[in-house]
Every structure is written in C-alpha cells, then in structure tokens.
Regions:
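Long, non-coiled-coil amphipathic alpha-helical linker/lever segments
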Residues: 1-34, 94-107, 188-193
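Short polybasic/polar patches that bind polyanions
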Residues: 18, 89, 251
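Glycine-rich cofactor/substrate-binding loops
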Residues: 154-259
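Internal glycine-rich alpha/beta core junctions
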Residues: 7, 35-186
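Charge-rich, acidic-biased intrinsically disordered regions
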Residues: 16-41, 68-84, 139-154, 192-198, ...
C-alpha cells in the first residue's frame, strides 16, 4: 500500500516538475525573497526526496521481515532450526539469527522511524503548498471543489484544509515512531510492555500514512499553479534579487564583502 502510494505521489510530482520546469518564481530563504528559481525545480526536489523515501521503505520492509520459532527464550530447547526456517520461509520471513522470546524490537523501530521520515517528506510538500496559498503569496493553491465551503463564518475564504490535514497526520506518525523507539528496551529475554503499543501503532501508523499519501497525491495532481502571481512576486524587489552578482563583481575588484 505505502509503496503504491509513494509511486502515485512521485508520478504526480514529476508531472508538475516537467510542466513547470520553465516557470520562474522567487526562491525564499528564511521566508524572505532570495534569488529566482523555477517551480519545476521545487517539484524536482520533492521528487528526489520521495525517491529516497521509497528506497528507505523497501530497506525497512526487508529489515522487519524476520520471525522466530526458536522457543521460549530463543534456545531451540524443544524445536529444530530447520523447522523454524521451513515455516518462516512459507510466510516469506527470515529466521531471526539471535532471538530471545521475541524478535528484537530495533527492527520494528527502523520501520516506524522510516514511516516518520516519509511522513515528514509529505509534510514538507504540504507545508510548502500551504505557504504558497497564503493570500499575500497566492502562487499556488490546493484544489477547491464546486460547492465546497471555505469557512463556516467567512465564506470568502479558501482554506488549505487538505494539506493541513497531511501536516497533522505527519505529526501523529512521528509520535508513533517515538513509541517504537521506546519499545526497543525490554526486560531480559522479554516482557510485554511493547505489545499494547504495537497493537495501536502498527495499524494506525500504516493506515494514516497511506491516507496522507493518497490525499497529498490528489492535491498535487490537481494543484492550481499560478505563473502570473509568481511573476508578480518575482518582480516585487526589482533588481535587488540579483544582488549576489553585484557583490561578487565588487569582490573581484577588491572590495571587501562587509563593505
């Protein structure tokens, strides 16, 4: 599910990157106008990050694909390793090389922290869209359906509720990752302090992130990109956005940077 969701989102981002590779806009650092970029470049950065997320998720899936049937404390006191290998093989799992009563929970922590990083990537895209949709910026906006209400009290508004929702889910998944990290340390060969946690975070984190990926993909697919507003904002500071070129020319002539 998650890999399919990443693939759909990456495909949508790639379309926008290619469509707007020549759409100029102002780049911002610290929220302040910096130098020109293109909207396609911004999307290309998202695309590359999602590719890294996909590779990490595949690696995390492999990391967690282990099981154990080696007895109460992992000693094979009443079982044979061959039996464990056969049964786990049928389930598509590998035998845990050195188990206790359970598979060590560092494997699970890697999986959930990977989900948290993926959630952070989704939040990065969603947060950018939210910023670009602000009235003072107006360079892009999430889709707004016919008959959709922007605000119960202020009907003129078009709030970025879809991307806000994605940002909220990312926070939730990060919290689940922290819970998974807390599960690594168990008493001796096992206690069950991890069990109640995993019963919640395993389905919730996976399903919440699947939903966020689908929602964000829909937003990117139907994203309202506004090149005219980008051009207006790009010219807001006049030629000041090319100040670095002036600075470098002066430095080459011997003027100190702090002058």
């Amino acid at each position: 599910l998650l890999l399919t969701g990443i693939d759909r989102l990456r495909a949508a981002v790639r379309v926008q990157a290619e469509r707007h590779k020549h759409t100029p806009m102002i780049g911002r650092t610290h929220g302040i106008h910096a130098e020109p970029i293109t909207f396609g470049l911004k999307c290309a950065s998202w695309y590359a990050e999602l590719g890294r997320d996909r590779r990490r998720l595949v690696a995390a899936r492999d990391e967690i694909a282990f099981g154990k049937l080696s007895g109460a404390v992992g000693t094979f006191a009443n079982n044979e390793p061959a039996i464990e290998a056969t049964i786990l093989g049928r389930l598509g799992l590998h035998p845990e090389p050195i188990a206790t009563q359970v598979v060590p929970r560092d494997r699970h922590a890697v999986y959930f922290t990977t989900l948290a990083v993926l959630g952070g990537s989704c939040e990065r895209i969603a947060l950018e869209i939210r910023h670009l949709q602000r009235t003072e910026v107006g360079e892009a906006a999430e889709p707004f359906g016919k008959g959709q209400k922007g605000s119960s009290a202020m009907p003129h508004k078009r709030n970025p509720i879809l991307t806000e929702n994605v940002c909220g889910i990312a926070r939730l998944v990060r919290g689940y990752a922290m819970a998974a990290l807390e599960n690594i340390a168990l008493w001796h060969e096992r206690d069950i302090s991890h069990s109640s946690v995993e019963r919640v975070i395993a389905p919730d984190a996976t399903l919440a992130l699947d939903f966020a990926l689908a929602r964000l993909a829909g937003v990117v697919e139907e994203l309202d990109v506004r090149p005219a507003a980008m051009a207006t904002n790009l010219s807001r500071l006049g030629g000041a956005i090319f100040s670095e070129q002036v600075l470098l020319a002066l430095v080459r002539k011997g003027v100190a940077r702090d002058q």
